[in-house]
Amino acid sequence: MTVHVQLEFTPNPDTLKYTVSRPLLERGAASFDDAAEAAPLSPLAARLLGIQGVTAVMIGRDFVTLTVSDPTVMGDVHAVVLRDLPAWLDGGTEVVTSVWADRDHAGDYDDVAQQVIEILDAQIRPAVARDGGDIVFDRLDEGVVYLRMKGSCAGCPSSLATLKQGIEARLRQTIPEVLEVRAV
């Protein structure tokens, strides 16, 4: 079956989001910003990071988001992705290796942190994934939730508004112990 790739625009002008016609990951997202570090975990991400101008790759369930360092090379990056990504996926390039897939994705969290993670996973992450991004729980410290912005969320002009008006408001409404949300 030939994999089809389609560009979708995101609120972040520095990213390109490509939806693909087959699942890439069963759950979560894989983010990389160094080809050498990505190679043992995601051969696909390593190849994408090898494209001139690509500085970060995030792989989601059925999409890939690329962060591009220089807007003047966006067209070149797009042409390479449209040409090579379907061929790589059809040719069997591994999306993530068993080393990445077997990592422990769950931490040992207290009840409040677990509530935060459940809301993020059920309500927030699916919404930001539609724009090619991801928001990952980092830690909870004295009522402050620290989150990592990935993919098109990283560096997006509207990410602070999303963080404060959307995520912080939702978490504070549901979990009284949450006082603030910050990006790391």
Regions from the PLM with identified roles:
Residues 1-184:
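Domain-level signature for proteins that mediate thiol-based redox and metal-cofactor handling
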